[in-house]
Structure formats: C-alpha cells, structure tokens
Amino acid sequence: MHIFLIRHGESMANVGANYEKRIPDHLVSLTENGKAQAYENGKWLADYCKEKNIDLSKARIWRSPYLRTRQTSEEFNRHLGISDIREDITLTEQQFGLFDAVPEEDWKRLYPNEYAEYKRQCSNFGKFYARLPMGESPFDVAIRIHQFMGTIYRDFEKHGVDTLFIFTHGTTLRTFLLRWFHYSPEWYQEERNPKNCWIREIDGNIDLGYINDK
C-alpha cells in the first residue's frame, strides 16, 4: 500500500487570526498563502507520482472534514485529478478543549488552575498521555486513528484501493505514523510537527520520511 500523509496548508490559526475572530476550529480556513502552498505542492506531488510511475487509477483521497483540510485537498487535486474523495471524522485535529484557539503562551494566564492540572499530568504521565482540559491527548488521537486504519485495510482487501492521499493535521499525522510503524511514545515526543503542506510518504512497511521538506 502506498500512502501519502499531507498536513494542511497555512491556516488562519497558524497566523493567529482565528483567536482574534473567534472562529470555531473546524471552520478555520486557509490563508491566501496557504492556498498557494497547497496548489504548488499539489503540482509538485503530481509530477513526483508521474516520475515514480505511481498508478493513480485506483487512488483515493481521504481527508479530515475540517475546512482547511478540505481546501488543501482541493488545491492538491487540481493536479492529481482523483475522483474518489472521502472524509472521516477520525482524521480531525487533536481537540484542544478549553485551550482551543488560545495561544499556548496564554494558557497559564487565562486558565491557571486548569493549566496547573495539565502540567501535573505531563509531569506524572508524560506529555503524550496528558489530556488537555476538556480535550484530548496525543494518546487519545492515536486510539481513534487506529480505527481509521481498519477502514483502509478493508478497502485494500475488498476493493484493491492501494494508493491513498490522506489530508490531515499535525498531531493526527504523527499518531498515524506511530500506529502504522509501531513507533514508541518516545519517538512521538522527539518527532517534529510537520510544516504546512509537508508530505510524508509510506511505501508498504517503509517510512520514506517527508519528501518535500525543503
């Protein structure tokens, strides 16, 4: 199975505009720069697939239903030309709960008690397992992403869908890698969050890393 994991392009949240406008996370859109990133990297990826003789006739796009991942996939697909497009709620971003849309440097000031409890969990259990107040931990995201893997295995076995382009979010992308390759929580802690529109390639049981991290 050939899989391309793709983080969304630059969003309003990445430049802090969602906090000012109080935009719900699932409705945060790409910036104009983010749309350009997605368009340019989509062209790059289409050329890459052609150069590597990757057959897209049975390819499928999976994406998080958030607006920014939808927009990213649409810009990429201007070049990929894939008609089979599906969404899955397990591909959504880590839920930040009380801290959603709040800059991390403001967590302690705005929510001192909740922040103290979160830091206690980080100290006692590690950041991978520590759950954000009213939100999720990376561990929680890893559990739900494992459910999605069952879907793509079934599609491969029953319908021969063997090339996937998965448009998702930073934490979700890394937990996918953790589950697919049985990486450790320590690996997750050391693994950098991908930049916008970075593409991670998986060929069967081989992690080829980010192929456009220029």
Language-model regions: role of each:
Residues 1-2, 41-44, 51, 82, ...:
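Acidic, low-complexity terminal tails and accessory targeting/binding regions
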Residues 2-83:
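Active-site-proximal alpha-helix that buttresses catalytic centers in soluble enzyme cores
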Residues 3, 59, 160-170:
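Generic beta-sheet signal
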Residues 8, 89-90, 169:
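Active-site glycine-centered loops adjacent to acidic/histidine catalytic or metal-binding residues
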Residues 11, 172-173:
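Short active-site segment of divalent metal-dependent hydrolases/proteases
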Residues 24-28, 77-144, 210-213:
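Phosphate-handling substructures
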Residues 63-64, 143, 167-168:
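Short beta-strand scaffold positions
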Residues 146, 150:
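Helix-loop module immediately N-terminal to the HCX5R catalytic loop
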